[in-house]
Amino acid sequence: MSVDATTVRRIAHLARIAVTDAEVPHLQGELNAMLAFVEQLGEVDVDGVEPMTSVTPMQMKKRVDAVNDGEIADQVVANAPATEDHFFLVPKVVE
């Protein structure tokens, strides 16, 4: 699979990226190189290779799942222009 100049312009348009005509050949080469690399990865024989999530065997540290209120409600709402009972007061937006 290869990317042509029209495809580069379409991708740029969909991504809302401004691309000049001078940049199209460079981007075309970059995209084609990426696709070639992905095709190369597809040719790698991975039969018998166990899936892995990390190169080093380690366990995530776990904490006790304890429910609390954070004990900082006053600090959380301190910068709000209007509060009531630790809740933010906002202007009514739906009538």
Curated annotation (Swiss-Prot):
A single GO molecular function term of this UniProt record: ATP binding
Signal peptide: none
E.C. designation(s): 6.3.5.-
Pfam families: GatC (PF02686)
Function statement: Allows the formation of correctly charged Asn-tRNA(Asn) or Gln-tRNA(Gln) through the transamidation of misacylated Asp-tRNA(Asn) or Glu-tRNA(Gln) in organisms which lack either or both of asparaginyl-tRNA or glutaminyl-tRNA synthetases. The reaction takes place in the presence of glutamine and ATP through an activated phospho-Asp-tRNA(Asn) or phospho-Glu-tRNA(Gln).
Similarity comment: family membership: Belongs to the GatC family.
UniProt subunit comment: Heterotrimer of A, B and C subunits.
Database matches in HAMAP family: GatC (MF_00122)
Name under which the protein is recorded: Aspartyl/glutamyl-tRNA(Asn/Gln) amidotransferase subunit C
Organism name: Rhodopseudomonas palustris (strain BisB18)
Organism classification: Bacteria, Pseudomonadati, Pseudomonadota, Alphaproteobacteria, Hyphomicrobiales
Gene: gatC
